[in-house]
Amino acid sequence: ESPFDTMSEAEFSAMSTSEKAMRIYEHYGEALAVDANGQLLSRYENGVWKVLPPQDFARDVAGLFQRLRAPFSSGKVASVVDTLKLIIPQQEAPSRRLIGFRNGVLDTQNGTFHPHSPSHWMRTLCDVDFTPPVDGETLETHAPAFWRWL
């Protein structure tokens, strides 16, 4: 549930810029992060962090102001977005030992398979499902080029 479903225009307008930024973060299910340079926003969706085009995100934020009929300007929207970038988690580099699949993440170091998690910081996924090897199947005999492919 979004805080914008129950908040009034008066409540929102009375908030500080940082409080507005936090409500926007909550609206996005706390699934936002900023890159190491503090500029690019990403949203966690379906196992990966996807970069949000800045103008599209600004328009979405303006839409939240409009939803409440709260007055805004491009400067106010930019201020809230810039403040949001200071509050949300900073993206980490994905571990080189992890391979993302549609149905989860394979840890190549220990061979374990895990459900997707924002903490994996994956930016891409292979567009196939991972299936565990059948009895007798090995990378050496059934996929000898696998490690070169990586």
Regions found by a protein language model. Give the residues of each.
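Glycine- and acidic
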Residues: 144-150
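Intein modules and their embedded homing endonuclease domains
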Residues: 1-140
